[in-house]
Design a protein with these regions (language model features):
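Secondary-structure end/capping motifs
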Residues: 212-322
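Short glycine- and hydrophobic/aromatic-rich loop-to-beta-strand nucleating segment
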Residues: 87-88, 201-204, 208-209
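Ligand-binding pocket segment of bilobal, Venus flytrap-like solute-binding proteins
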Residues: 50-51, 151-186, 205, 242, ...
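Conserved C-terminal helix/tail region of periplasmic/extracytoplasmic solute-binding proteins
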Residues: 296-374
Length: 374
């Protein structure tokens, strides 16, 4: 099986499944394919060059709905991780007195619109949604007050170093790397925005699942085993970091990976803490469950930011993409994993808004800052 990934910490389940033989246990061989950008992952997945991929949650939903591309029937087989992304602001902003979101708001208020550029990794991706939500929570319109651009994750630090952006939202290890290189600081983690949010998923095409149901189940089972192994002990997490640092995976220094994988944070401004919501892979198997409300949340944000001009059938879209049936079959094969009794979960985001999937269109339209024409 050829499975694509972007060199980010949260591709860890793929690395461990291959290294520890969990793929072989379920009768498959996982061949990991490192890709340069999320656009490359999308194109190869659609073309059939990849069987499946470590992919941004929102990217999968954007593909299904044909946002900026031809619609493609997609499937989310499992969530690979929660939490663990961040927003980095540049040292240049710090020199202007910005150390938090409030300071950024004050600077932008006294500047011409579009004076500052912020990067994310894909227009419908998780990082775009975290960045937009964070900015808007302080009254900063991400489409009018600032400029936003798309940059592949491995290129974020380089682009900040040469002054192409004032901030970015990306996965690890690039936020930790920016601090190490003294070019930026962590202004917020993604779990500050939404504690226990979904992040990367195992994505594929629906026709592939229909043709290969047993292989799909085996792949999910192997990755569940890998998730469980990573979370079993701090030493397993450290070993995972050592593996990910190798050339075939992230090709970086172990020190950029280990701390934040263990929930040990340093924001680059002197604050250190043990995060209550670190990058999470297991939690008794609950992390991997493809909650319908998680997928529906991304649809609400597509509506908010004008990516969907008409209200979708939120529940129907999530129900056809999130393959709970495949997850259940894999969980049974692995053993010791109980499926949640419900398909929705409730979360409270940074602005106090509760999301539980009960009124998605009302939720999408209640925000004071929305993209004009949405």
């Amino acid at each position: 099986m050829r499975v694509g990934f972007i060199p980010l910490t949260d591709c860890a389940p793929l690395a461990i499944a291959a290294a520890k033989g969990f793929d072989q246990k379920y009768g498959i061989t996982l061949v990991a394919s490192k890709e340069a950008s999320w656009a490359a992952v999308r194109d190869k997945l659609v073309a059939g060059e990849l069987d499946a991929a470590h992919i941004l949650y929102g990217l999968l939903y954007g593909l299904e709905l044909g946002i900026a591309s031809k619609p493609q029937a997609m499937a989310n087989l499992m969530t690979l991780n929660r939490n663990g992304q961040a927003i980095t602001l540049s040292s240049e902003l710090q020199e202007k007195g910005v150390t938090d979101l409030g300071g950024l708001k004050r600077l932008i208020d006294r500047s011409a619109p579009g004076s500052y550029t912020f990067a994310h990794t894909f227009p419908t991706g998780t990082h775009a949604m975290w960045l937009y939500y964070w900015l808007a929570s302080a009254g900063i319109d991400p489409f009018n007050d600032v400029r936003t651009v798309v940059v592949p994750p491995p290129q974020m630090v380089m682009n900040m170093r040469i002054g192409n952006m004032s901030g970015f939202c990306v996965g690890e290890p690039w936020n930790a790397r920016a601090i190490n290189d003294r070019i930026g600081f962590t202004a917020a983690t993604s779990q500050d925005i939404w504690p226990e949010h979904p992040e990367k998923v195992l994505g594929t095409r629906r026709d592939w699942v229909e043709r290969n149901p047993n292989t799909a189940r085996a792949l999910v089972a192997a990755l569940m085993e890998a998730q469980r192994w990573i979370a079993a002990s701090p030493e397993n997490t450290r070993e995972t970091a050592r593996l990910l640092a190798r050339r075939g995976w992230l090709n970086t220094k172990e020190q950029y990976l280990t701390g934040r994988m263990l929930g040990e944070y340093d924001n680059g401004l002197g604050r250190r803490w043990q995060d209550a919501h670190p990058m999470r892979f297991w939690a008794g198997g609950e992390v991997s469950f493809p909650w319908l409300s998680d997928g529906m949340w991304f649809l609400t944000q597509f509506r908010r930011w004008g990516l969907l001009k008409q209200a979708p059938d939120y529940l129907a879209v999530a129900s056809r993409i999130n393959r709970i049936d495949v997850w259940q079959a894999a969980a049974q094969a692995v053993g010791g994993i109980s499926a949640p009794a419900v398909r929705m979960r409730s979360s409270t985001l940074m602005d106090g808004t509760v999301w539980n999937g009960s009124d998605p269109e009302g939720y999408a339209r209640h925000f004071s800052i929305q993209r004009k024409g949405a």
